Amino acid sequence: MEQPMPAERLVPSLRSRERSPIPGLPHTLTELHLHVGGAVAPHVLFELAHEQGFKLPVRDYFDFVDLVTSNPDKVRNLEDYLRIMHEWTEKIQSSPAAIERSVYEIFAKEYRGSRVGRMELRFNPMKRNLGGERDLDHIIHAALRGLDRACLEYGIRGGLIFCLAREFRADLNEIIVEKAIKYRDRGVIGIDLAGTEAHALELVPESVERFAGIFARAREAGLGTTVHTGETPHTAGEGVIAAVRRLKVDRIGHGIRAAYSPEAMRVLSDEGVTLEVCPTSNLH
């Protein structure tokens, strides 16, 4: 994500590392919503798993692809999709070497495959440190090295968004925000709130107040803000309204249920909040 950008900027990104545009190209695409846990090619995950000595439940590569790939036959809801990430991709990416390569490969793949020259990539660093076994700063530094390498080699512009977790204790989410602020001049450009919407925290007044303080601190430090909400009936249009009015976010992740709420649509329009719509995943 790039910093909260005023309307006159090119795109409503959160916070920009103003990297030079690619010379000679007529245009490039922009990607605002991409997760490290869902964007690494299966063959890269397979290699990373073996490099780290993970004991996988399958030995054949194509069985592994099926294991880490979401499809309508086995993913019936958001919880099913998140389970794939939590059980396998996040675990495989939980080392400095693995997260560095993952970040690099995503940026490189998106540019080579679709000429995405400006991209914001998000992940929860605390879900990449094996519950505290890995040092959090080492994980973050490694991710930033992957970003730097991709930007150097491909001339792209990019930044990292740190995801808070709905299921985390407040003190853990506060640590993530502190790390985002610490590395805001190195390529961390914003924060997000992600996780199962069954934990509809934005609809619980005391939870909203707690997160409002966290998001305010991030904004004051110059970070952009976005929230996953309005993707499922658990949060619906009410979640979108709460995120905009109470958390004062710059953007909304998904937010497709706002389409069923005239009030939510009015709030989005009045406040100029962008929806990070993901047609492929939401249609599936």
Where are these regions (language model features)?
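Metal-cofactor-binding active-site regions of metalloenzymes
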Residues: 2-225, 232-239, 243-247, 251, ...
